[in-house]
Amino acid sequence: MTFQCIQDPYQLLQDIGASPRLIQHVKLVGEAAEMLILQFQNLSISFDLDWVRLGVIFHDAGKILHPSELIEKGNEHEAAGEMMLLAQGVDPLIARCCRSHGQWQTMECSFEELVVALADHLWKGKRNTDLENKVITKAATMCHQDYWDIFVVLDGGFEEVAAGGDLRISRSVGFNNL
């Protein structure tokens, strides 16, 4: 399945039953992802921007089947989301982000998958040192620079994204229906 514009994947989510709350969530994660994308572009890191954007939109698709996981911790949505997207004809590499965004510690993940996972943490102001270190390590390798040189730049950037977490959370409050 190919998408002609950014609204197409949102429409697919709605067509398969995504609630307004889930749509708002992926849009807020998308805001964090766009900030990360800009930071990586400023470092001249070459990666698949469209994949990241699609991954962000689809990463929690399984919460359509497990709506309680929109408000409670849980991971049943991960495999369910991947299967649901595959059934809709979504590229398997993109559908995989339903699992990799939550299982990045135990899966071999691409840079793009790690960016989706990181955006899913930072959107709400939550930092994750292990995940950030994985992203920085891959970024340093990709742009052929020293880890610590990249760390200094990206750590500040990650903090900037996280600093907007309270505002993004406040914008999700009105979407209480599952």
Please describe what each predicted stretch is.
Residues M1-F3, V26:
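Conserved N-terminal diphosphate/IPP-binding helix and adjacent helical/loop segment
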Residues Q4-S19:
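Generic N-terminal amphipathic, Lys/Arg-enriched alpha-helix
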Residues Q14-D15, N42-T141:
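Divalent metal-dependent catalytic cores for phosphoryl transfer on phosphate-bearing substrates
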Residues G17, R21-Q41:
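A positional/architectural concept
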Residues I23, K27-G30, L49-R53, E82, ...:
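Short, well-structured alpha-helical segments
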Residues Y147-L178:
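Charged phosphate-binding loop/patch that engages nucleotide di/tri-phosphates or the phosphate backbone
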